Structure formats: structure tokens, C-alpha cells
Amino acid sequence: MVKTRFAPSPTGYLHIGGARTALFSWAFARKQGGKFILRIEDTDLERSTQQSVQAILDGMAWLGLDYDEGPYYQMQRLSRYQEVAELLLKQGLAYRCYASKEELDALREQQRLAGLKPRYDGRWRDSKQTPPAGVTPVVRFKTPREGYAVFDDLVKGRIAVANHELDDLVLMRSDGTPTYNFGVVLDDLDMGVTHVIRGDDHVNNTPRQINILKALGAIIPQYAHVPMILGADGERLSKRHGAVSVMHYRDQGYLPEALINYLARLGWSHGDEEIFSQEQLVEWFDLAAINRSPAKFNPEKLTWLNQHYLKIAEDARLMELVTPILLGRKYSLPGEENMFKIINLLKERVSTIEELADASAYFFQAVEPAEALRTQYFTVEIRPVLEYLIDRLAQIEWKREAIHQEIKQTVSSHKLKFPNLAMPLRVMVTGEAQTPAIDAVLELIGKEETLHRLRDQLDAFPQ
């Protein structure tokens, strides 16, 4: 059975790159009818936090990336790492190294000055000397000195690294915790991981991990190293490109299906398809279709996709998402029926839930027009026309059709073009120059509030 895993370190939030790796691993497992494992690599005691663990779990849940096993935690498996390290020591495949940090720093400096690649020199590999007193050793792996570590990467193709290029990596730190390369190997082995899908910043780790797996007599999983994500400027994606946490996008009003769709297209494609569901992604997903070149992160494309998903979203769902924002702004909200109408009017005009909240503000409170709009639309000539319209609006039943007829009649009787009246009317009531159909807007704002705003704004007109 195919088994994939996502194994983040809880030292921050679930970011865009990590989310894409998780998505590809999840999609491949689902496509193959396999299992997807979540593993938390929390052995960096100084940087790992429970807050980060929760942020990862929240991000996965929001994106709908459900896992079949886990979350497993490395710190709960310490005895296993220690057990296997002891086994390798007994088999002569690992050794204790007592070199101090100062010694190793001095060695690296000598190598640097000599123009050599910094690497451990194996000074304790076959040493017979007495260990120094009071020094807790690390455990190092005896990397083979001959031959090659070879693997057929499912994205990059065949990769071969000469073993003499690799130094004897540390397996266990002096504090009894495993290093990344040792922990990940044992975890993948014990959990039966068949396919390791991860960022290509791990390519250099793979030959080391393969050598450890061979020493343990294990079956080597298949590897797929996904190219990194770049900013529009070609530099590695960072916060300055907008590469914030997944939950930041949620809080900014993006829908999870938009982010999933966008992440899937970052370095993977299915023909010319731009928009597809999570179910279609699973149906179409193929590691061979992952591009070998880095993908460029484009916030505008993500926003475009989000706009699409907002347009087709159920009004009830959008109301559920926008209501907490509106209540947080202390707005008094109308009943469900009118809220649905407001959302339906606006959802094709906005790109995020946050924008939906912003765009709906004038339905819940009077918004003062900008001075430039007053200057443009509040004219001496239009004032008597508006006074006439206000008197007529005060007498009608407050329905959209009736409002429309009164505006139309006023335009006709004063020999105006529709925008000549609709624009100042719109600005007076909403404070905006662009809104949905003005009759629909006025109906939802309500008769009393509309008339109040119109009369209030008349005072701002030149006499």
C-alpha cells in the first residue's frame, strides 16, 4: 500500500511551501488509494512550540487535508532512536565522537583557509584513544567510503552522489535526541512510508538517508523532490513576497478551496485546466506532471481564484464567514433574508471575505462621501430634483420595483439622463461612487434610513 507523509517542524506556522508539500503528499496518497500520515518533527527543543503544533493542525484542518495516521511526535519516540543507535554501534556501523565544538570549529576554519569543503574528518571513526573525562559524545554514522548513493527521483530523475563526498553525519546529539536525518529515516521506516514527497532543499539529505536505510537493511522508499517556490522577483519565497502562514490567508478572507486550487497549480498542471475541485485534483494528480523548474508565487492569481470561488459559493456559507467580521465592527445586522440579499448583491464584486465586509459597510451605517465626490455630484442644479425625489420616495411602499419607478419618473419629468440622478443619489446614501443597482441598494438599506441619509446629505449641497 502507498503511504506518504507530511512531517513539519513545529517552529512556526504552516506556510505556503509546507502547505503545498502537504497537498501533493495528500493528493498522491488519495489518488493511489493509500494512506497519508502526519508527523510532527519536534526534536528541536529550543524552537519547537505547542502553539506552532496547533497552527499546523489548524492549517491542515482548514485546507481539508485529512490524515489517516497521526499526528505522531518524534519526542514520544526517543527510546526507539536510542535503541537503533545502540544497535548500529554494536554492529560497527556507528561510533561515538567526543570532538568538542571548539575542535570542530577550528577544523572548519582550517579547511576554509585551505580552500577545502568544510566537513568532519572522522577523527573518532576508528580511534582507540581513551574518551576524555566529562564529555558526553554524539553518535556518528560510519558513512561508506566507497561506492555511490543512487536514487531515481520521481521529479528530478536519477541522482548519484559519491559516498566519499559525504562525511560521517551525527545520528544522536549529546542530549540524547536524534538529528533530522536519523529521526526521519527511522520514522519513515517504522511507519512504512513508501513515497517521500518533499521540497528539493532536502535533495542533499537523501543520499545520507539512503546510506542509513541500507545499513538497517531497509527497503528504500521512492523520493520526489518538489522544486522550491519563488517570488515574482525570482528570489526564494519569503514574507516580503506575501508568503505568510496559511491561516493568515484564512483571516484575510480567502476560501480554502481557492488556496488548494492555487497551491496545486504551483508547479503542477493538468493540461490547461486552471480551476478544479479538490476531488478533481485527486483524480488527475500525477507526480510525473510536477515541473522540474521552480514555481513563482503570484498573489494576484490567488486573488483571482478566490474571486471565482466567492462567486459560486452558497450565500449561507458566505454569511457565516462574514458575520463575525461585521459583528466585530459593532454593526447592527438585519435579518437572515436581507443578509442573503446583501451578500448576493456584492459577492461578484469582491475578492475576499474581508472585502465583502468592507463593501457592505454602507448597508449598516451611514458613510460620509469623500470631498471629491461631493464636489463632483452635489451641485446646485441637481438639488431641487433630489428634493422632488425625496418627497415621492416618502410616499411609496418600500419595494425595489416602486423605488425604480420613482427614480425613472423623476429622471423623465426633469428631462435628465439616468446617471445624472442615480450618481448623486448613490453617493448621498452610500458614500460610494460604485455600488450594485441603486434601487436594490435602497430597498435593503430601508425606507427610514434612506430618507434620513438623503435629507442629512442635502445640507451639504451648495445653496
Swiss-Prot record:
Described function: Catalyzes the attachment of glutamate to tRNA(Glu) in a two-step reaction: glutamate is first activated by ATP to form Glu-AMP and then transferred to the acceptor end of tRNA(Glu).
Gene3D superfamilies, per database record: 1.10.10.350, HUPs
Superkingdom as given in the UniProt entry: Bacteria
EC supergroup of this enzyme: ligase
List of residues binding ATP: K239
Keywords: Aminoacyl-tRNA synthetase, ATP-binding, Cytoplasm, Ligase, Nucleotide-binding, Protein biosynthesis
Family stated for the protein in its record: Belongs to the class-I aminoacyl-tRNA synthetase family. Glutamate--tRNA ligase type 1 subfamily.
Xref: Pfam families: Anticodon_2, tRNA-synt_1c
EC number assigned by the record: 6.1.1.17
Record's protein name: Glutamate--tRNA ligase
CDD domains given in the database record: GluRS_core
Span of the annotated motif 'HIGH' region: 8-18
Main location: cytoplasm
